[in-house]
Amino acid sequence: PFLSANIYQKSTGERLFKPWALFKRGGLKIAVIGLTTDDTAKIGNPEYFTDIEFRKPAEEAKLVIQELQQNEKPDVILATTHMGHYDNGNHGSNAPGDVEMARSLPAGSLAMIVGGHSQDPVCMASENKKQVDYVPGTPCAPDRQNGIWIVQAHEWGKYVGRADFEFRNGEMKLVHYQLIPVNLKKKVTYDNGQSERVLYTPQIAENPQMMSLLTPFQNKGKAQLQVKIG
């Protein structure tokens, strides 16, 4: 599902999309909230936003978490966001991102924020500081702010993020997290001067069903990109 709790239609004051989705997995009731950066109105084409309002994600998150806890009573609440991860909340000219939101919420009110937008592999070198040159296949320590884990799997399908949680006595504990490289390669130069690109980790085979599903869309996009516009 497409989820976003903070995108509203100005003319009606109603949300344009589902704010959350509920899932039953392993006997647990899991709520997933969607949130979108309010920078969208600034960086997108304004002609598409004449009747659309992007409200502050952190404020909407508080409302939605409250509503879920009162009405749905999930065992776990996660957030999937497109807001960006900025070290120690230093977002510069960008709208506040995941770190700032986590700090503004009740402690531990989300088990995890699965983010995007800043296109970083969020693997922390130390408190409030990401690794600058993360090497694919090496251990990755996610960020943790105010009792909330924050992860981001870089960009463009380069990684799959995997988080293993243990749920016991009503509490979620992260026991393992890793970024799994999807056939990423590095350049290796040999003593004879020749070089080649080799995989960081063992190759992941293509899934025929997924390729069948996605190829028509890839071809459609390719055809549009080949149209001469000037």
Residues covered by each model-derived region:
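Short, well-ordered amphipathic alpha-helical segments that serve as non-catalytic structural scaffolds
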Residues: 56-67
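Short acidic, glycine-rich surface-loop motifs adjacent to enzyme active sites
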Residues: 32-42, 65-89
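Active-site-adjacent helix-turn-beta-strand microarchitecture at beta-sheet edges
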Residues: 1-55, 93-228
